[in-house]
């Protein structure tokens, strides 16, 4: 059985857990403390970040998008819709944008005190500009391309969720992102998010095995 080292609130680990749930892949979940990472995790992934997926054959996958892609490869019908070439390219471009730019600004908005000479409001506005552009690509559907979740949805959801958490009242006001707001609210109320955000006790080597997901 694969083993997933995870941390509940980490957006990258959330990506991995959503992919595992949607692909109906059962793993042993090891919830870790980011301040006291287990030696068994550090030995297989020296970069010391979650998620880390240890496969049955000994392979290590320690990038969230690569875990999503592994799940897709092993569960061809993981997503109900088959995307066309343009949709696939759009999805990959948006995911790259979030990983390289949105996350950069999000950290400096949400955790401004950790950085020197940072104007949190300007980084918040940079995130909002990205969301306003993205908002035009959701039109009367629950997800980006249809009413069915796809790779792009689970890849950007954790970061948009964090963006809202930083100031919910501000986010929920009229910010020019009505479709994104509806899209996010749909996910916040979804079974998918409820499953992936379930609480797990911190893993210890002698603890009983905890399986994820538990309610397929």
Task: Please give the residue ranges for each predicted region.
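Extended, well-ordered alpha-helical scaffold segments
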Residues: 122-127, 175-189
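Charged/polar, low-hydrophobicity segments characteristic of intrinsically disordered regions
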Residues: 186-205
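Acidic/histidine-enriched, glycine/proline-rich intrinsically disordered or flexible terminal extensions
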Residues: 200-216
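Surface-exposed helix-capping loop/turn segments at secondary-structure junctions
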Residues: 136-147, 192-196
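GST superfamily/GST-like fold recognition
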Residues: 146-169, 173-176
């Amino acid at each position: 059985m694969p083993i997933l080292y995870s941390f509940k609130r980490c957006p990258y680990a959330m990506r991995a857990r959503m992919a595992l749930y949607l692909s109906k892949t059962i793993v042993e979940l090891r919830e870790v403390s980011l301040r006291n990472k287990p030696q068994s995790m550090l030995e297989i992934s020296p970069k010391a970040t979650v998620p880390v997926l240890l496969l049955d054959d000994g392979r290590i996958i320690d990038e969230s998008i690569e875990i999503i892609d592994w799940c897709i490869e092993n569960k061809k019908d993981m997503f109900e819709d088959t995307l066309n070439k343009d949709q696939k390219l759009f999805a990959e471009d948006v995911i790259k944008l979030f990983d390289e730019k949105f996350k950069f600004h999000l950290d400096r908005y949400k955790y401004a005190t950790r950085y020197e000479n940072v104007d949190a409001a300007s980084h918040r506005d940079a995130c909002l500009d990205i969301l306003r552009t993205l908002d035009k690509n959701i039109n009367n559907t629950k997800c980006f391309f249809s009413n069915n979740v796809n790779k792009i949805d689970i890849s950007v959801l954790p970061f948009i969720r964090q963006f809202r958490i930083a100031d919910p009242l501000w986010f929920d006001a009229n910010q020019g992102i009505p479709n994104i707001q509806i899209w996010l609210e749909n996910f916040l109320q979804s079974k998918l998010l409820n499953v992936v955000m379930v609480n797990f006790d911190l893993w210890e080597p002698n603890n009983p095995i905890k399986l994820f997901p538990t309610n397929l």
